[in-house]
């Protein structure tokens, strides 16, 4: 199984069990959620004084006024809150309620003991325990030798040498350079300049020095240096036992405690494992975790709470509401639609919102702050509410969302936007509870008394006593410039045209200066009188210290440098003109072009290539053969006849044109072209809407074929089959006959669907019975009369066709198992008249004179038209009747003469299978016909080029009437004609009147489906039965 799905499964699935914050490797993070809570806030109420002023001469300032008190009330609010959640620390995943280490590579033959650290089973090596190479070998086939010196091992996959302590990588051939030791020679010798053992760092002290670090001097003696006894343990290690081994203090390990603890371990001899998570570092001496920014806790397992970030979570986030602050560095993660360092800038221009900023905001522009750049929700100005910020706050409420309450006394009105009271004249204060201060009067105490420099002023008429610095009786004239004080006798000491106060002599500096004597210029960022004004510039390099005019940066303009350059301009003071084409905009700071969707290039001068669109000219999703793609938004414009999101769907039947919006106007089964709506008519119809039938002597598709009838007779408008006059036959009516026959179509007979259902049920029962009696019936036919009237079905020769059915010898009865041709058996000699005529049968009428006496009976041939077939029209015919009526006459030397019968052809009378007429295999070869005695044998093969048409034939009324007149008997012919039962009552579909005496019932040998598709054999001759009583039982 691939490793990636295993990792995802390990990280994503939570098995049974619950994490505990005290469990190892469990960390805490904070998640935000929405909650409804009860919030307290202060609401003002007024308390009237116990006594009020009623004496008009009293100073109103000395009277007690109503006092305002605040009481705590509660309201329900919806706000965002956060809560801690437990999860496995980085490098671990949850399994059965515990956090187990996770290895990025599967430990094939081992187990994961720490994050990305495998403990291999015996005999296996490598980071993932998948190699069984012997020591000193590596590679996928373990056929490469490790090129590592000093018997060093190598990685079984990469061949990288694992150099032991004291040898230099990469090949472990050289010892550590002087002054270095340990693994990879990463530590410096601690021997006061002396060399050390490259493996464990033991010092090689020079003469005169001793100690584990050569830090103990030896005394000089007569016999050399005398050195005190020392132990090799470094870094405070304590010797143990007689072997000189050392017990290392916390943070050190090795034989002489010269190696610091490796990462992840601490304590004495580095035996304790660190438990610091989320990138925290462990102090190798104490094991205390030094957490990375964004995490706290004794194991660095807790993420900074919401709103805090940085080292030890000491910093406060400064992100806009709705944005999230990253705990590590405090960067703001903006919600959709906002950008900027604090997520305060909208991505969409003012007044627009949506994914492409294409939707206009519906907020009242005067009373709304903005609309949300993604979903368009209006942010109302304080004092306004409603979906579109067009509803003012109710009385005594104000603020954002009208959530705050206000209280205004003495007839004051509350301003819905700020909650400030608009007090009645003479009152002031947050709740209009106080009189105007001395020397003021009027609405909001904005008017001063007429002697505004008086010691005292009436709030009504402004009467006053002059103060220092003023002169004349009404205290309206100040001291002259340069003087101040009582009687204006002191001189001012103000520089840079500063003016001193006539009362105190304090200097009022001109804009741009400050100080006791106006001798100092304004500090940077301040301007104006007394440098009291702060520069109000958004994107500037400071402002003018005198009048505060902002010095705008490139790309900005306006009094506060708060307006970006207008469209089409950029640079300092927006003095440069953009050169972007095709609707592109330029960056106001540097003039770079930002192209509109559908264009590209440095100046947006090039459109997207065909088949691409949008800002990045991405691939269109339209079907290139049936549509075009809008270069801006990729919208597919379908060509006529196509529809769908990508124009890959053709118009549904009955529709055409652009967007398939036009309805087809084709009749009689015609279809219309999906692009231009032109009608494609069925054979036999023409005209723009297929409403016109074919003109005389024309037939076929669009009536483009000429009838091939030799005598100028009419032909079928769909198939072109000729309707021959009496005495002629053949596909083109060229064949004459001694005995002429006319086969006339009759009108279809209608019946209700219930009759069709009953007929089908009866037919099914009869078919089962007939199959059981079939073998006996064949034997019963043998030895009967050999004289039959053969009626051969042949297709009429159409324009361009190459086949015709030859006449059939009268001496034989044949049937051909062919889907387009069928042969009727000849009538038998005159038997006794039956008592009952079975079913609807096929009869052939004859009005020709009798044959010579040597003949046993009449030899008649009839060629049926090509449109003889099984047809159905639900509103006219049932499901089991053929739609032609034919007549048959028979004469015998002993009989009374020919008879004529008409009747509808049904599948019971014909014995024909519907499948033989509507078979999907229209091709067959009819083999040789039996030759007559004394006549040369002729072979006839007919290859069928197509199945019979399924369209109902159409005949003009005059042609049908003429055919019916031709079938009327002559008074002198001796022919008896029995009228069709359908001529007077079309509802009697299945009934036939009794036959005249001496006329046998019609017989039709139906074809059976051949076992070889497309090729049919000639079955044995079948003779009609002679006993009439048995014929009636069929």
UniProtKB/Swiss-Prot annotation:
Biased composition (Polar residues): 972-991
Species this chain originates from: Mus musculus (Mouse)
Organism ancestry: Eukaryota, Metazoa, Chordata, Craniata, Vertebrata
Residues where Phosphotyrosine is found: 923
Biased composition range(s): Basic and acidic residues: 851-883
Phosphoserine: residues bearing it: 951, 1026
Name assigned to this protein: Platelet endothelial aggregation receptor 1
PROSITE patterns named in the record: EGF_1, EGF_2, EGF_3, EMI
Positions annotated as glycosylated: 150, 269, 474
Renumbered residue ranges of the record's region Disordered: 823-883, 925-1034
Extracellular side: 19-754
Record's subunit section: Interacts with SHC2 upon its aggregation-induced tyrosine phosphorylation. Interacts (via extracellular domain) with SVEP1.
Entry's transmembrane regions: 755-775
Tissue occurrence: Expressed in thymocytes, bone marrow stromal and osteogenic cells (at protein level). Strongly expressed in kidney and heart. Moderately expressed in lung, spleen, thymus, liver, brain, testis, skin and stomach. Expressed in hematopoietic stem progenitor cells.
One of the GO biological process terms: positive regulation of platelet activation
Domain EMI, first and last residues per copy: 23-101
SUPFAM superfamilies: Growth factor receptor domain
SMART domains given in the database record: EGF (SM00181), EGF_Lam (SM00180)
GO cellular component, one term: lamellipodium
